[in-house]
Regions:
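Metallocofactor- and cofactor-centric catalytic cores in central/energy metabolism, strongly enriched
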Residues: 1-409, 416-496
Length: 496
């Protein structure tokens, strides 16, 4: 079993695949270095002399600079490494020399639902979308009181509560409206009840304008202040929606119709070595099959965005990517925050030292395929292949944004573990075997087998594709079995 991995030949550090005790001789890629101190799993050890101020190289890329001289065998982490990041950057388009669509492969099929507008779905659920936080508890009670309607091909009745829809202004208010309307359009929702109070800022008329054309059999509205008994009224509407949703049955659908979100959270030092490269290989496989994948977490691209921007399929897509990256940096700066105020305490405990370190691991989820489009918050995926989506690193907010973009399911890699799920089925992928064994009630797929030397990234990616097809065909994720699903809306404005 290998002790460490030397990711790039030019790296001056290796990453411990397992804990390395002080005094252990570590041999990797022709290098032989004795650990001068204990090196925890996922953490970095110098394999070459690194001078004070010299860049620390991992993934073949600077992830910060040393703040003290370090000899081979030294533990390299937050105590002796600091970020190189600052503010906005002027980028230039330098397309990768091998930039071209990957060779096509005949897509497999899954057993999904075909909606009347032609879109594919992997779940056949009824959703209740509150337009304002004031009706959250009403929505929850409606769900609890009407579970008897979940019969036949209907797979669930759910609501997604939130605190917004009122006391917001301007862009913030518009973002909430746009996000909620996008959820109403999601294909996994066979039918939707939009539930409002009646006096909120997000008016019925505004919501209708945002929603645009819709199927009146699929989407119904209820304003609680307009009826005497909102529970009886909701029951009547849900009976109609259940009759509509119950018409759909699973049928063979090509994988090319799938949209898959890609996310990481609770990352550790193995995220960029096991789980994220596996997801990246999966993303390439999806692109070859004519499917779509979505990459977000813009702040966790900072410091590694060049890897992605050079893969934009053309100059127009590059310009959109540039505006997205610098726009998010401006968002930080406008709030008097530094762009490198990341990683989290859990990330650091797992071996991630700087934002560049985290970002270089994060972007591994994007694989090697060209970036075909860059889309805004609340906008749908319309282009096949790899898409970049405007959204923050926050797990709940970014996973909600990917769901709103049309992701049928989300691949979520984690080195520390997390139980949450978006409205779209959320597959948890562990970076290490101890986590998969400890939190078997959370983890759906273990890429720790790569660090253990049991499987290659290619083999793990093929296994992951097989699992995605099974989940798309109805197999429940661990989070679904627990009943976990929620949303969080991106907010950046004042509260009235």
């Amino acid at each position: 079993m290998p002790q460490a991995i030397h990711i790039s030949p030019i790296d001056n550090v290796v990453v411990a695949l397992h804990p390395i005790a002080k005094g252990t001789l570590v041999e990797v890629d022709g290098l032989a270095v004795t650990a001068l101190e204990d090196i925890p799993q996922g953490h970095k050890m110098a394999v070459k002399p690194i001078k004070n101020g010299e860049n620390v190289i991992k993934y073949g890329f600077p992830i910060g600079h040393a703040t003290a001289d370090a000899q081979p065998g030294t533990w390299m982490h937050t105590h002796n490494v600091h970020t190189n990041l600052s503010g906005e950057v002027e980028y230039s388009y330098n397309p990768a020399p091998d930039l071209a669509p990957l060779p096509k492969v005949e897509p497999e099929t899954f057993m999904g639902f075909r909606r009347k507008d032609g879109r594919a779905a992997i779940r056949n659920e009824i959703w209740i979308i509150p337009t304002v936080g004031c009706v959250n508890d009403i929505a929850k009670k409606i769900v609890a009181d009407n579970q008897d309607l979940v019969t036949g091909s209907i797979e669930g009745l759910y609501t997604f509560t939130h605190p917004f829809g009122c006391s917001q202004t301007g862009h913030d208010h518009a973002q909430t409206r746009k996000l909620l309307a996008a959820l109403v359009r999601h294909p996994n929702a066979a039918a939707v009840l939009v539930l409002s109070l009646g006096c909120e800022n997000l008016t019925h008329e505004q919501f209708l304008t945002e929603l645009g054309d819709y199927d009146h059999d699929r989407v119904k509205f209820l304003t609680c202040q307009d009826v005497e008994d909102e529970f009886a009224a909701a029951r009547d509407i849900l009976k109609e929606l259940a009759a509509y949703a119950g018409q759909f049955q699973r049928e063979p659908i090509p994988v090319s119709d799938l949209v898959v979100g890609m996310k990481c959270g609770g990352s550790d030092g193995l995220s960029g070595i096991t789980a994220n490269p596996t997801i990246g290989r999966f993303s390439d496989m999806m692109g070859q099959r004519g499917g779509s994948t979505v990459l977000t977490e813009v702040p966790e691209m900072f410091g590694a965005e060049g890897f992605l921007m050079d893969r934009c399929i053309n100059k127009d897509v590059f310009v959109k990517a540039e505006h997205m990256i610098n726009g998010f940096k401006e968002y930080f700066i406008s709030h008097n925050e530094v762009v490198y105020d990341n990683p989290s305490p859990g990330n650091k405990a797992g071996g991630i030292t700087t934002l560049e370190d985290k970002s270089c691991g994060c972007v591994q989820k994007g694989g090697t395929a060209p970036i075909m489009d860059v889309i805004g918050y609340g906008d749908p995926v319309v282009t096949k292949g790899l898409n970049m989506l405007y959204g923050p690193g926050n797990d709940l907010v970014s996973a909600t944004a990917m769901t709103a973009a049309g992701a049928h399911l989300i691949l979520f890699s984690t080195g520390r573990g997390t139980p949450f799920s978006a409205p779209a089925p959320t597959l948890k992928i562990s970076t290490n075997t101890p986590l998969a064994e400890k939190k078997s009630g959370w983890i759906d797929f273990n890429t720790g087998v790569i660090a253990d030397g049991e499987k290659s990234i290619d083999e793990a990616a093929k296994d992951l594709l097989d699992l995605v097809i099974r989940v798309a065909s109805g197999e429940q994720t661990k989070a679904e079995k627990h009943g976990f699903r929620e949303i969080s809306i991106f907010k950046d404005g004042v509260v009235l």
